[in-house]
UniProtKB/Swiss-Prot annotation:
Cofactor(s) in the UniProt record: Mg(2+)
Entry keyword annotation includes Lipid metabolism: no
Biological source species: Bacillus velezensis (strain DSM 23117 / BGSC 10A6 / LMG 26770 / FZB42)
Name of the molecule in the record: tRNA dimethylallyltransferase
Binding site for substrate: 15-20
Keyword tRNA processing: yes
One annotated GO biological process: tRNA modification
Job of this protein: Catalyzes the transfer of a dimethylallyl group onto the adenine at position 37 in tRNAs that read codons beginning with uridine, leading to the formation of N6-(dimethylallyl)adenosine (i(6)A).
Marked site positions, Interaction with substrate tRNA: 104, 127
Family listed: Belongs to the IPP transferase family.
Start and end residues of each stretch annotated as Interaction with substrate tRNA: 38-41
Length: 314
């Protein structure tokens, strides 16, 4: 019996694995429009550090949820869920196939499953205490506190993202349940006829690509991009918790020399990629394809297209 739910394609994978190029080729084959599955690409002026697709690279394929907020704005998982579900409907109404591409697992999961969020419930005094802890002992100490209490949430949230780390701790403090427990008690049926494809790669090769990508970002103006935000006094905003920005802020603050900041950026990017792979493997029904070079990209594209077409009966 044919699945009557709205078809959606999801392409996930760690940073630097090659999602962007492959997704555009697939979107053209599938008559799809792409929705960003990256929590930081929503911010304007943060192009290089978040590896946003350029106008030329899109090859005419429409992209959504990119450059929609100012760097000073806040953006939650609940906001993402609401926006993306609206975009899925819009795209489908145009007769196109919605395709989410990215690596922010919790955001993508929130769209696909019947998750509800209690964004307004909290404890301001506890939150202030956690903010003080982060300021005095650092983001790593705060993240370690979350890892001890809720390892699953800690795996999904980067230590630089202090706001989300505090929110996860606050949920536990207020309700007595971890964020992971809250999500588990909610309905686990996919809301869409979703095909989830994951790109993976030999870890050492991937780490090498990440290091090269950071070098290329710096060559193409990442430090200037970060300095513009720094000069605008964008400091405590969620956007600056992104990898690449927080590390270079440390340099601009005079706390560390540039080579040390760059090495920290590379290390944080590698650690994030490792967490992304672990999270997607444990949390979502993903069909994986290996992109370790040498690989025939056109052949991979064809194989993935046939997998999607078969599952969606298109």
């Amino acid at each position: 019996m044919k699945n009557k739910k709205q078809p959606v394609v999801i392409l996930v994978g760690p940073t630097a694995v090659g999602k962007t190029k492959l997704s555009i080729g697939l979107a053209k084959m599938l008559n799809a429009e792409i929705i960003s599955g990256d929590s930081m690409q929503v911010y304007k002026g943060m192009d290089i550090g978040t590896a946003k697709v350029t106008e030329e690279e899109t090859e005419g394929v429409p992209h959504h949820l990119i450059d929609i907020l100012e760097p000073s704005d806040t953006f939650s998982t609940a906001d993402y869920q609401k926006m993306v579900r609206g975009k899925i409907t819009e795209i489908a109404d145009r007769g196109k196939l919605p395709m989410i591409v990215g690596g922010t697992g919790l955001y993508i999961q929130s769209v696909l499953y019947d998750y509800t969020f209690t964004e307004n419930s909290g404890d301001p005094v506890f939150r202030e205490r956690m903010e003080k802890l982060a300021a005095e002992e650092g983001a790593e100490a705060l993240h370690a506190k979350l890892a001890a209490a809720d390892p699953e949430a800690a795996a999904a949230i980067h230590q630089n993202n202090t706001r989300r780390v505090i929110r996860a701790l606050e949920i536990l403090h207020v309700s007595g349940k971890t964020m992971s427990e809250h999500l588990k008690t909610q309905k686990r049926e996919l809301l869409y006829n979703a095909v989830l494809i994951g790109l993976t790669m030999d870890r050492e090769v991937l780490y090498g690509r990440i290091n090269e990508r950071v070098d290329l970002m710096l060559e193409t103006g990442l430090l200037d991009e970060v300095k513009r935000l720094y000069d605008m006094n964008i400091r405590d905003s969620q956007s600056i918790q992104a990898i690449g920005y927080k590390e270079l802020y440390e340099y601009l603050d005079g706390k560390v020399p540039l080579p040390q900041a760059v090495e920290q950026l590379k290390q944080n990017s590698r650690r994030y990629a490792k967490r992304q792979l672990t999270w997607f493997r444990n949390k979502m029904p993903v069909s994986w394809t290996d992109m370790t070079p040498p690989v025939d990209i056109e052949q991979k594209k064809k194989e993935i297209f046939e997998c999607i077409a078969g599952k969606l009966e298109i």
